[in-house]
Amino acid sequence: MAKNYGDVYHVEGWGEPYFAVNKDGHLCVRIYGRETLPGQEIDVLSVIEQATSADGTGKKLQFPMILRFPDVLRHRINSLHTAFANAIKYTQYGSVYQGVFPVKVNQHKDVVQDMVHFGYDHSYGLEAGSKPELLIAMSCLTKAKPGAYLVCNGYKDSAYVALALAARAMGLNVIIVLEMEEELDIVIEESSKLGVEPVIGVRAKLLTKIPGHFGSTAGKHGKFGLPAEKIYEVAKKLKALNKLHWLKLLHFHVGSMIPTTDIVFKAASEASDIYCALVKEYGVETMTTLDCGGGLGVDYDGTRSGSSDMSVAYGLEEYASSIVQAVRLKCDYHGVPHPVLCTESGRAMASYHSMIILEALSAIPEPKDDEDEATTEQLHGRIRDLSSKLQPTGLSMSSHAVHIKKHGIEMYKLGKKLSKSVTTDAHTIYNYHMNLSVFSLMPDYWGIQHLFPMMPVSRLDEKPTHKATLVDVTCDSDGKVDKFIRDTETMPLHPLDPKLGGYYVAVLLTGAYQEALSNKHNLFGGPSLVRVVGTGNGGAFNVEAALLGSTTEELIGTVSYDVKQDISSVIEERARENKVWEMVEKLVESGLHTMPYLADYKPPPMA
């Protein structure tokens, strides 16, 4: 049997249970998770080849592209509900779990509609944080099981509240969650105008928070929600208005990636105390639901350590068990009926079902400058020399501070070079030019240094011999990928060989937030989209939809140009003056109606 080099990319860690390397050395998708039978895996290279083959009109999809596997979405939803069902049964919890998918995580029509469709039997609902998202949710939830939640979060004006009340009048189970005390006045006013009685919740600002980037909006200094004493003020105000029965839900959110279950347990316990106080001390006997927000994380680096923003130290079962046990213990202690449990788990539901496919254009050895040629011992010597210059001198204090800063920066740079020298000694680093815009396809990498697992789609039965960084096609020095999971500055790739066909790198676990946050730097836009559904054994699949990414004409139109009037007509006029319109017309038409990324590029052979 051929050697499998999937372990070089740690696929057995972050990829469990959906990704593996098959006998042909290709990345494959196990669409049913651990229940995927031998032969049911979908070969990613086969999908790419089918998606890029010309159709009856001679047209074919361009790179980059996103592959969606909706079967994985279905499996994620079922797995989440199974985890909560098992925890509820094991602990003899006295209520049920009923979750929602936050539309902000991936607003694409197919994804949101799939979430509602696949979650129908579980009364799976949606969460909206703005008026556009609310309209999407209102439409999609007309196909949901009656009673599915439509949770309305985010800051609200009168129009938002009125729209939410209209959705309630349509028979949807809408809950307006107060982020600020002032929003209650808006709800009261709009309810009176429309004659629609609302159901409201309130967001708690907990003291529990998580470390790192994803915990920055939690804790007492968090952006959203009310501290416990303000929540009780809301209850008092509702009671004075004889509207206490409106209040039915308590919501909290401590961060998008909770690293460990002890924080999950602590947050659920703290929120349960507030929930129980509302019922027992403030007489809100209509309370029914505890919404535990997001935070169910994804183990992007596959370490299962929870030691960074890229990792969580638990799975679905441990997460569900922590919430159920924490809430049960507090409610039993206070003598309060167990509430319906809701979570807004978006990242963990959507991440696995989607991957970005990048096409390698060329690979060029990174040139070494004089300092890069320095030996490790020479670099050590330079650092020692700089250290000796940091001793106190007769300079003034301010001059001495400038002196220390200057040499400190030099030492830092040399230290970085020393570190790189140690890790890449005797290895040339190659810059792989990819048909990619980091800003459009991987905005979280560029914006918050979020790392995603990456690996070649094929040749995984060959040892990758090149240490590589990835550079994109934008005219921006930030358009590169030189940080990878497991804290490395290169990733192993194979030499490019045109005789073997295209060489593709998959960026995985990208189904959450990347499309929503995408931008158009250099007017490189969105990728082609391919929807892939398994059809049974033998790795059979159907490409249900294959959509070309944003064309140049569409992208130019987004920045206030009238393409016909401001672009085509102006170019035509000048081209006719120079008697070259016959040539220019074809090129302009082709340029406008294709994606701005490179097409039909043939990489040169590598030495």
Swiss-Prot record:
User: What keywords are annotated for this sequence in UniProt?
Assistant: Decarboxylase, Lyase, Magnesium, Putrescine biosynthesis, Pyridoxal phosphate, Spermidine biosynthesis
The record's EC number reads 4.1.1.19
One Pfam family for this entry, by name?
Answer: Orn_Arg_deC_N
Keyword Cell division, does the record have it? no
MF terms (GO), sorted A to Z: arginine decarboxylase activity
Q: What class of enzyme is it?
A: lyase
Q: Where does substrate bind?
A: 290-300
Instruction: Identify the InterPro entries for this entry.
Output: Ala_racemase/Decarboxylase_C, Arg_decrbxlase, De-COase2_CS, De-COase2_N, De-COase2_pyr-phos_BS, Orn/DAP/Arg_de-COase, PLP-binding_barrel
Give me the reactions it catalyses: L-arginine + H(+) = agmatine + CO2
Query: GO biological process annotations for this chain's record?
Result: arginine catabolic process; putrescine biosynthetic process; spermidine biosynthetic process
Pathway annotation:
Amine and polyamine biosynthesis; agmatine biosynthesis; agmatine from L-arginine: step 1/1
Family indicated by similarity: Belongs to the Orn/Lys/Arg decarboxylase class-II family. SpeA subfamily.
Q: What is this protein called?
A: Arginine decarboxylase
Source species, please?
Avena sativa
The record's gene field reads: SPE1
